[in-house]
From Swiss-Prot:
Described purpose of this protein according to its UniProt entry: Binds directly to 23S rRNA. The L1 stalk is quite mobile in the ribosome, and is involved in E site tRNA release. Protein L1 is also a translational repressor protein, it controls the translation of the L11 operon by binding to its mRNA.
A Pfam family reported for this protein in Swiss-Prot or TrEMBL: Ribosomal_L1
GO molecular function: rRNA binding; structural constituent of ribosome; tRNA binding
Assembly: Part of the 50S ribosomal subunit.
Identification of the protein by name: Large ribosomal subunit protein uL1
Keywords: Repressor, Ribonucleoprotein, Ribosomal protein, RNA-binding, rRNA-binding, Translation regulation, tRNA-binding
Biological classification of the source: Bacteria, Pseudomonadati, Pseudomonadota, Gammaproteobacteria, Pasteurellales
Length: 229
């Protein structure tokens, strides 16, 4: 831990916390200090002009990033009949109904995303206490409860990110890996911010996207000058 602490101190010392960096400069800084032995993720924190205490101002949704996230996603689908075949053809890793529910109850959850057709919610609903705390419970607001499970599987596999503000009104998600090109990361960030802008609650007044910061898995946060986007 001492080495990590020393490294973090040096990174924070090199990043001007009072400055909003132009996007390409920010990405260059992130790449410079991404020296972990694995390919670090590039994460984003977006401070929104909302009151998270008000339910009608909470922001939640999903969008497909043009260049994906750089990570392989395992998808489980609760459905049956023709939809089950369509889900398999679309690339789902696990497809089932009661049999899949039994695996979940046993703690066998080797998947990152859960999708369900509406008729399967009678089964999935019984798994709320298991899936909910893990952020895996299907929800129509993010497109994971849908009659078109094949498209949902394709979206999940092609780099869809889900977002939801925390209690401080901040969205945290990933926009790729540090080995992505500057242009790929920039375009992914632009796609996310465009999706957030469309999701602005009608009751939210004033500046909606107040601050955007990027960081890598092991790095410090870098504030972004939104004018450079």
């Amino acid at each position: 831990m001492a080495k990590l602490t020393k490294k973090m101190k040096s990174i924070k010392a090199a990043v001007d916390s009072t400055k909003a960096y132009e996007i390409n400069e920010a990405i260059a800084v992130l790449k410079q200090f991404a020296t972990a032995k694995f390919v670090e993720s590039v994460d984003v924190a977006v401070n929104l002009g909302i009151d998270p205490r008000k339910s009608d101002q909470n922001v939640r949704g999903a969008t497909v990033l043009p260049h994906g996230t750089g990570r392989s996603v395992r998808v489980a689908v609760f459905t049956q009949g023709a939809n089950a075949e369509a889900a398999k053809e679309a690339g789902a890793d696990l497809v089932g109904m009661e049999d899949l529910a039994e695996l979940v109850k046993k703690g066998e959850m080797n998947f990152d995303v859960v999708i369900a057709s509406p008729d399967a919610m009678r089964v999935v609903g019984q798994l709320g206490q298991i899936l909910g705390p893990r952020g895996l419970m299907p929800n129509p607001k993010v497109g994971t409860v849908t009659p078109n499970v094949a498209d949902a599987v394709k979206n999940a596999k092609s780099g869809q990110v889900r977002y939801r503000n925390d209690k401080n009104g901040i969205i945290h998600t990933t926009i790729g890996k540090v080995n992505f090109s500057e242009e790929q990361l920039k375009e992914n960030l632009q796609a996310l911010l465009a999706a957030l802008a469309k999701a602005k609650p009608t009751t939210s007044k004033g500046v909606f996207i107040k601050k955007v910061s990027l960081s890598t898995t092991m790095g410090a946060g870098v504030a972004i000058d939104q004018a450079s986007l």
